[in-house]
């Protein structure tokens, strides 16, 4: 059969598939770190070497290390590292060059040790050590340069004084069809009796195989020159049908007992079997027949990448652990995440296992499950524990190791400790946790330790287990029920006596390999359930504080050590809470400063035992012999009004009646949940029938509350009424009612609350809407002075007198209105003759109008007016002055007939003006002004016939801007009238001119005669008194004298 192209070696796949808890009792401070040559992959494999009970050291594989072998490059090595920390030295398993044969007269190598990855696996069993080179190549055909990775192993015994090579797949007929790509030593383990198990996953077109052999057979009669060697008791699994090609059986191996015959079986991982789902086989060690398989749950998860055996639940039966580091977790519809899994199969009896317990990794690409090791009983609790490697998890992919503790039902699902890699590598991840080995005690403290390899960083780390201390602590309170009236203790420096009680702290310890004396650091917290800043009801007698730190020295195991502390109760006026228990809490920890030895690891408290103890004291209350108050709380409430109208200043008072028909209710409070529409305004204080409570506004979980104190306690038989006032204004999103929730709450344990009262107050909307209007002028008097009709008028004055109708829609309230329709019917013509010719429509406020037909169809020129005084006056409720111009000669009263003919939309043609009115709040208006001209010619043709022109306006409110609507929405209508009447002029007489002249002349003659008669009678002469005559004469005489 022709050879297929050899795949990339499987060893590289195992190493590079993913290229790019809190602490418990593995000590992360006192580490032993071994380092190897850079780039050697030191730490790729590790194990403990215990040739005798008194000697423990560490073996570390470095598969890319250089050795002293001539002409061999990076052949790989195994290092022996002493403990305590000592320098590591290479173990000289093989110091030779490649063996050669003569081909056509030339000596050519028959084996190839360069890059053979010696040290990729290493295992020790007592004084025996086996290390393998799975990429060791062998030249099968002497006349062909081709070579095959058959793999080889070396055995060291007698403290590395004797060595033997073991290459079970090296033969003269090696090829892919056979064992040419075997890679023997890819995995490695020992039976308990010391026999060797070797995995060769590349045999038979990568079907894989497992091989077992006795170390004694390998050593006996070994000769370096004996290249092709067959052992008498060697066992190998054979070739399977072609459907098993590329399965990789032997990728991992382990040994355990599963058939109940006390004879161990071997376990082999087959990560690409079962159509790439992977499986693990239990194989009979006697004849290597297959007994049972466990199959993976997900394709390509690499189920079987690693296997381990441990009695996790300590039932005497071995259990199987399987790693699937490429398992991908799918969460809902999110992208799958590669997190890895570990499966635990608990053995219940021979051939019978439970369904697997599954541990799932948490970090993407962390490769959780790449390594699994049995740790032994790490914390000495009677159950074995395991470690799981996630070599590419953590910060910068430095790697993690997770410790899982066993218990009676398997493994605890959360790790008790997570070890983090401390090294980062620029070229590749450090691989911390890629290989693990446990279940050996290097420091002889009776606790097993752990080795972790970090081949990318060239490190191997030994973690030592810390002794576990289990503390049994308790608190004793005397008395547990404190009588606040029994004041027998006087604190230092205080003249007052207080009630007090004793807190006794007792503790004992035990543990494996613990010193005779340990010291606990303790902290006592009084009333620990009270939040920070709250009043602590009890204080230490000597310190007046609610917490105290102290130490307990315990000199030997299992002996109880106690300390007493005196505690007192504050005065009752200093706190409200009398019912809830007084929590006394003890926290403790180990005083590590007490341990002086720098080499020994310090003990640690048991992770699975809470380092705290709690007890509770109670305050004696007046609640009978059982000190348990059981109230019987009742609550009723009514509002002082049944209905709230939107838009009004709604103030509502809740009249509330709390009642207690049982025993005292402590810290009793009335809780009122306020609806969004309401605001708390206060307590009613002016009604003597209502008790005045102390109330506060609060926010509880974003809920607005009013909380009122009802007493501490609210005594038995309490029954009263109180009034709480609210202002209700915010109705934007209100439904048909608002709801207040009321309840009494207390701190009593039983019957702590009253019935819940839901108080509903109905909400309604109501608005009074008024439409009003005016005509300006109210009447037109014909005929018009100095006006002549024109056949084709172009200016508005040529049509006739101005007529304006003004309409206002006014919301009196209290609620707002929205979406109102306003209609105006306007008498525009009768037959072919115009009546009122519309020039312009003007609006004010949230009003949008349109007409049923065009206006000003004759394109009459007009000036667009601003708000006229009469419109402004109308809108602001002022008196509208009508200035009616009368004809100068028309001074008589208008001529009226008994009745005027009414012209409206019932008998003439009208234009319909439709308006949509927006939201009008209380007291707001919208107005419409129609500016028109009376078509005078139409009426002058009907001389002396009076008319009344009537426009009709109506409105209807469609809805209000609230969720709640009134039963009937406002609507109404009115008519605005303009009268057209005729004047009747007074009769006038013409006087001739000569009559006027004659009348003037006669008048002047009469005036002259009258004047002459009066003069003749002395009417114009002035009579003087005698004294005045004398004075005048004296004055005259004096003047004359002076002149002289």
Curated annotation (Swiss-Prot):
Disulfide bonds join 81-88, 132-153, 169-182, 489-500, 506-562, 623-629, 695-708, 849-905, 910-915. Ca(2+) 3 binds at residues 377, 379, 381, 383, 385. SUPFAM superfamilies: Integrin alpha N-terminal domain (SSF69318), Integrin domains (SSF69179). Keywords: Calcium, Cell adhesion, Cell membrane, Cleavage on pair of basic residues, Developmental protein, Differentiation, Disulfide bond, Glycoprotein, Integrin, Membrane, Metal-binding, Neurogenesis, Receptor, Repeat, Signal, Transmembrane, Transmembrane helix. It comes from the Eukaryota. It is a single-pass type I membrane protein. PROSITE patterns: FG_GAP, INTEGRIN_ALPHA. InterPro entries: FG-GAP, Int_alpha_beta-p, Integrin_alpha, Integrin_alpha_C_CS, Integrin_alpha_Ig-like_1, Integrin_alpha_Ig-like_2, Integrin_alpha_Ig-like_3, Integrin_alpha_N. Residues 1016-1044 are cytoplasmic. The keyword Membrane applies. Pfam families: FG-GAP, Integrin_A_Ig_1, Integrin_A_Ig_2, Integrin_A_Ig_3, Integrin_alpha. Ca(2+) 4 binds at residues 441, 443, 445, 447, 449. Ca(2+) 2 binds at residues 311, 313, 315, 317, 319. It is found in: Membrane; Cell membrane. Prominently expressed on axons and on cells in contact with basal laminae in embryos. GO terms for biological process: cell adhesion mediated by integrin; cell differentiation; cell-cell adhesion; integrin-mediated signaling pathway; nervous system development. FG-GAP repeats lie at residues 28-90, 104-165, 170-222, 236-288, 289-354, 355-413, 417-480. GO terms for cellular component: external side of plasma membrane; integrin complex. Residues 24-991 are extracellular. A motif (Cell attachment site) lies at residues 437-439. Residues 1-23 form the signal peptide. Ca(2+) 1 binds at residues 257, 259, 261, 265. Belongs to the integrin alpha chain family. PANTHER family: INTEGRIN ALPHA, INTEGRIN ALPHA-8. This is Integrin alpha-8. The gene is ITGA8.
